[in-house]
Amino acid sequence: MAVGKNKRLTKGGKKGAKKKVVDPFSKKDWYDVKAPAMFNIRNIGKTLVTRTQGTKIASDGLKGRVFEVSLADLQNDEVAFRKFKLITEDVQGKNCLINFHGMDLTRDKMCSMVKKWQTMIEAHIDVKTTDGYLLRLFCVGFTKKRTNQIRKTSYAQHQQVRQIRKKMVEIMTREVQTNDLKEVVNKLIPDSIGKDIEKACQSIYPLHDVYVRKVKMLKKPKFELGKLMELHGEGGGSGKPSGDETGAKVERADGYEPPVQESV
């Protein structure tokens, strides 16, 4: 064996010596997540992000984060089968300002509606709102027994299914095309679109459990801070406020300037 120094020993410390454990949470900050004014509950929770270090800015890590919240939590309600997706668009101080990003029905609600002896009718359509958001809406409805019907089954004919699907597409297009995103969300909260479809299709074949089951955000217009501030600032949500955080105005940034109006 060659005589020489043992390199492992001269490097210092034993092999496999424990490193100093640093708590990862000591480098992180909590931010409040603020929902738009159309919802009753404004403060929906908190989110973690690593503090600003060098070129890595904390607010950049928050922008684009998507939160999925039950409508019952947003409206302080009992009915909880709708889930809203909300995306962080801007950070003001310790507040994440979020906007609508999509909607879905819960899995258990969808499964509870699908049954034997009835026809399931589905439709989908891509529609653009007046303020430039491109949405894909999915609708679902089920046939039901007519009054005094003895027969067990209530199947619609293929021609009737096509007529109902056409009506679904017409109503969804009309309701979205003529409104901006805020008004569309206000219609999705109580699902007035589904009720309109159910009413319009009674003459073709009686329906029940008609819902806009899913909304996808396909395209967004260029981000404008003024429009986001309008969603969060002026005007509370529909219904009575509940809690201190309800309908509270979000502080505006120091450098914020209102958008220039084309006509007075």
Swiss-Prot record:
Compositionally biased tracts (Basic and acidic residues): 242-255
GO biological process, one term: translation
Top-rank taxon, per record: Eukaryota
Stored Pfam families: Ribosomal_S3Ae (PF01015)
Secreted among keywords: no
Main location as per UniProt: cytoplasm
Region (Disordered): 232-264
Coiled-coil stretches noted in the UniProt entry, renumbered to this chain: none
Similarity section: Belongs to the eukaryotic ribosomal protein eS1 family.
Subunit description: Component of the small ribosomal subunit. Mature ribosomes consist of a small (40S) and a large (60S) subunit. The 40S subunit contains about 33 different proteins and 1 molecule of RNA (18S). The 60S subunit contains about 49 different proteins and 3 molecules of RNA (28S, 5.8S and 5S). Part of the small subunit (SSU) processome, composed of more than 70 proteins and the RNA chaperone small nucleolar RNA (snoRNA) U3.
Function comment: Component of the small ribosomal subunit. The ribosome is a large ribonucleoprotein complex responsible for the synthesis of proteins in the cell. Part of the small subunit (SSU) processome, first precursor of the small eukaryotic ribosomal subunit. During the assembly of the SSU processome in the nucleolus, many ribosome biogenesis factors, an RNA chaperone and ribosomal proteins associate with the nascent pre-rRNA and work in concert to generate RNA folding, modifications, rearrangements and cleavage as well as targeted degradation of pre-ribosomal RNA by the RNA exosome.
Protein name: Small ribosomal subunit protein eS1
Natural source organism: Ophiophagus hannah
